[in-house]
Amino acid sequence: MKLVVGLGNPGTQYAQTRHNVGWLVVNEVARRWGATWRKEKDAEVAEIRLGPAPGVKVLLVKPQTFMNASGKAVVPRLSFFKLDPGALLVVQDDLDSPFGLMKVRLGGRHGGQNGVRDIIRLLGTEAFARLKLGISRPPAGRDPADWVLSRWRDEEQSTLGDLVRLGADAVERWATAGLAEAQQAFNSTDLRPRPEPVPAPQPADVSGPQETGPAERPEV
């Protein structure tokens, strides 16, 4: 059995914010497999099976504790199902990666992500997998705490849709094939929008007018 946790904040006002990209990914996984979310203590959960029959049982989890207390929805479930940290994947936003980049990694510090910070604190180890989805640093002068709670801009929606789709693919690959294969398949993902190429300037015509001979007299 595997536990996949999408980090985010509860409430419709947060549903389309940068901090909730983890929720978008686990929602997409649940949608693909026809899973129904149900309310439990501190979380909404959905069960699916991935891979060839009988498949790998995966419990998708969306903490309902607000970001800073995410560990309360995660650690008791690991304990209840007698799972070690190697069975856990946390899907999170990542301020330190440009929007459009995605990476799967094992362990490491929380990097200022307070949901991950709380899971590490309650679990007592950093040794669990993360799927990190880049949301970029805020523009100069903008508070990061305000930035992560801001909504996606209209021009970001297309890239966001691709990022969520590939994030769901990465969750499925991790659950069925393991960490190394998920890293190999998805750590080169780069969906950053490319600027339109600027046409090269055309050289000016400096040849000048062409000399011509006298006009021929028409025959009569």
Curated annotation (Swiss-Prot):
Q: Which residues form the active site?
A: 19
What would you give as a GO molecular function for this chain, any one?
peptidyl-tRNA hydrolase activity
Show the InterPro entries listed in the entry: Pept_tRNA_hydro, Pept_tRNA_hydro_CS, Pept_tRNA_hydro_sf
Name the keywords, alphabetized: Cytoplasm, Hydrolase, RNA-binding, tRNA-binding
Q: Name one GO cellular component term.
A: cytoplasm
| Cell location | Cytoplasm
For region Disordered, the annotated ranges are 184-220
Q: Known NCBIfam families for this protein?
A: pth (TIGR00447)
The identity of this protein, by name, is Peptidyl-tRNA hydrolase
Q: State the organism named in the record.
A: Deinococcus deserti (strain DSM 17065 / CIP 109153 / LMG 22923 / VCD115)
